[in-house]
Amino acid sequence: LRGTERKRELDQAIVTATLACVDDFGARGSNIAAYNPLSSEPGPADFAALLAAAARTLFLPISLPDGVLAWAQHGAKDAAGALGITEPNGPRFTSNVLRSCGLVVAPALAVDRQGMRLGKGAGYYDRALAGLDVPVAAVVYDWEVVDAVPHDAHDQAVDAVITPEGFFRI
């Protein structure tokens, strides 16, 4: 899909579906956590900027070398991070800042209808979300919604799934 007109169409539909999900969870105008997509991930390059318009503050992840995510506010000067992902500069927060969010929007490689999310296998998001009572929506393309994904006891289920076709709660 990379670089194609079809990907642009799907990614624009993901923005629309994500904003609808934000509204459904009552998170518009509250703090939201999201991500800057890699070219292989769902969402356009300006995904964070588009979501920031709906948030009081948009927090973006920063990958630390020890497999932990830190968070910084969108709008701080961006720089290439450790994993090649564009990350904001500025004050860093622990994942406890997610407690202030009305919604966490997370990328995934796949998600099943029970809400189990398949990430890239490093467990960054599972560690960040462990023990937090915050709604999480996984963003995938429609064909990445599957019957079942492999998961372990530490894997965190999501509360909603966002695709170009819309979103659904688990």
Please place each PLM-identified region on the residue numbering.
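N-terminal active-site beta-alpha-beta segment that forms phosphate/nucleotide-binding
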Residues: L1-S95, R99
